[in-house]
């Protein structure tokens, strides 16, 4: 069992396999010159897997593959199969924009993937284009349909932005209702890599939009999830709200993150990280385990909003979210 320096059980590892993405979403990585990590600096699947085995052997039972856009990494299904074959009962999920799912969903399912978290910020082609800076909606919807068709579990994430897609909260939620998919509204998190003009909706504003049509009741958080859940009285549908500015989910935080070049990150809201790259490149399991232990010991107790270090509008970290998968 993995325990951090504040007595929390850590059993969830998020693994970024690439920082690259085929979208340029305004809240994450809008058009600008990027200093991509050279391909030769990325850890191989075998190197990533060596560390993941250490983590799984010591208590990790939930893994999410992220990016960037993870489906851009070649032979991702073989990596999924490595993980599944090593620990078939692992809760294995992937975060994606769904653009490449029409041609990859079946392979991912066959490899052992269980669930997908998919970003869907608009059902209007022109708004989806505005956010992603690419004509994406038709392909994304096909990807969602394909994922459901092959039997993958699906959750939808939406980032409501003022003046852009804030009038679609009910539309996107009802799209999910019709397909028995859970939606989670994610409050926009300020960062230096997003467009400066963006303004996100606060959690209470998102809930107010839902209340314009439905009666809702709070359910609370499920386990260590950062999502605060609600149910709709009229039909029993459940949805979630991830509101890092207001809801203190740090006390039950159970996750750490590994980047594609081997940095182990204890908290998304801080820059601190340690590299496991040297250890896994030489196959040193003991050293990799020691790095993991150090990161757990130094994992912050609370995020920086809760500590009062940040005021509204300030960024959480200089590290781009596309480097860590959020």
From Swiss-Prot:
Top-level taxonomic group: Bacteria
Binding site for GTP: 14, 64, 95, 155, 255-257
PROSITE patterns xrefs: MOAA_NIFB_PQQE, RADICAL_SAM
Catalytic activity: GTP + AH2 + S-adenosyl-L-methionine = (8S)-3',8-cyclo-7,8-dihydroguanosine 5'-triphosphate + 5'-deoxyadenosine + L-methionine + A + H(+)
Any one biological process term the GO annotation gives: Mo-molybdopterin cofactor biosynthetic process
Co-factor note (free text): Binds 2 [4Fe-4S] clusters. Binds 1 [4Fe-4S] cluster coordinated with 3 cysteines and an exchangeable S-adenosyl-L-methionine and 1 [4Fe-4S] cluster coordinated with 3 cysteines and the GTP-derived substrate.
Binding site for [4Fe-4S] cluster 2: 250, 253, 267
InterPro entries, per the entry: Aldolase_TIM (IPR013785), Elp3/MiaA/NifB-like_rSAM (IPR006638), MoaA (IPR013483), MoaA_NifB_PqqE_Fe-S-bd_CS (IPR000385), MoaA_twitch (IPR010505), MoCo_biosynth_MoaA/MoaC (IPR050105), rSAM (IPR007197)
Cofactors (names): [4Fe-4S] cluster
Binding-site residues, S-adenosyl-L-methionine: 27, 68, 119, 189
GO MF term set: 4 iron, 4 sulfur cluster binding; cyclic pyranopterin monophosphate synthase activity; GTP 3',8'-cyclase activity; GTP binding; metal ion binding; S-adenosyl-L-methionine binding
EC number: 4.1.99.22
List of residues binding [4Fe-4S] cluster 1: 21, 25, 28
Keyword line: 4Fe-4S, GTP-binding, Iron, Iron-sulfur, Lyase, Metal-binding, Molybdenum cofactor biosynthesis, Nucleotide-binding, S-adenosyl-L-methionine
Pathway per the UniProt entry: Cofactor biosynthesis; molybdopterin biosynthesis
Pfam families to which the protein is assigned, alphabetical: Fer4_12, Mob_synth_C, Radical_SAM
Ranges of residues in domain Radical SAM core: 5-227
Family of the protein in this entry: Belongs to the radical SAM superfamily. MoaA family.
PANTHER family noted in UniProt: MOLYBDENUM COFACTOR BIOSYNTHESIS PROTEIN 1, MOLYBDOPTERIN COFACTOR SYNTHESIS PROTEIN A
Role: Catalyzes the cyclization of GTP to (8S)-3',8-cyclo-7,8-dihydroguanosine 5'-triphosphate.
Subunit composition and interactions: Monomer and homodimer.
HAMAP family: MoaA_B
Entry protein name: GTP 3',8-cyclase
Originating species: Sulfurovum sp. (strain NBC37-1)
Name of the coding gene: moaA
């Amino acid at each position: 069992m993995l325990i951090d320096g504040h007595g929390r059980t850590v059993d969830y590892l998020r693994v970024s396999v690439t920082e690259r993405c085929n979208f340029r979403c305004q809240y994450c990585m809008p058009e600008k010159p990027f200093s991509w990590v050279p391909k030769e600096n990325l850890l191989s699947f075998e190197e990533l897997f060596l560390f993941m085995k250490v983590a799984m052997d010591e208590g990790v039972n939930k893994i999410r593959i992220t990016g960037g856009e993870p489906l851009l990494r070649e032979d991702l299904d073989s990596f999924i199969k490595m993980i599944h074959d090593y620990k078939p009962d692992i809760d294995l999920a992937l975060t994606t924009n769904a653009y490449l799912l029409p041609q990859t969903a079946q392979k991912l399912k066959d490899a052992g993937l269980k669930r997908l978290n998919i970003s869907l910020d608009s059902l209007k082609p022109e708004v989806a284009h505005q956010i992603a800076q690419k004509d994406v909606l038709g392909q994304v919807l096909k990807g969602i349909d394909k994922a459901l068709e092959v039997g993958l579990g699906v959750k939808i994430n939406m980032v409501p932005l003022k003046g852009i897609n804030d009038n679609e909260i009910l539309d996107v939620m009802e799209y999910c209702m019709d397909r028995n998919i859970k939606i989670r509204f994610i409050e926009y998190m300020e960062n230096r890599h997003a467009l400066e003009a963006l303004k996100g909706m606060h959690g209470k504003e998102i809930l107010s939009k839902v209340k314009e049509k439905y009666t809702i009741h709070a359910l609370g958080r499920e386990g260590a999830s950062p999502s605060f859940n609600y149910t709709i009285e009229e039909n029993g549908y459940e949805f979630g709200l991830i509101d890092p500015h207001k809801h203190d989910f740090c006390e039950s935080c159970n996750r750490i993150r590994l980047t594609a070049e081997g940095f182990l990150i204890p908290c998304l809201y801080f820059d601190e990280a340690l590299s496991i790259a040297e250890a896994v490149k030489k196959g040193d399991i003991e050293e990799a385990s020691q790095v993991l232990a150090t990161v757990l010991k130094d994992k912050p107790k609370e995020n920086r909003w809760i500590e009062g270090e940040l005021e509204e509008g300030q960024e959480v970290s200089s590290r781009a979210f596309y480097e860590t998968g959020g």
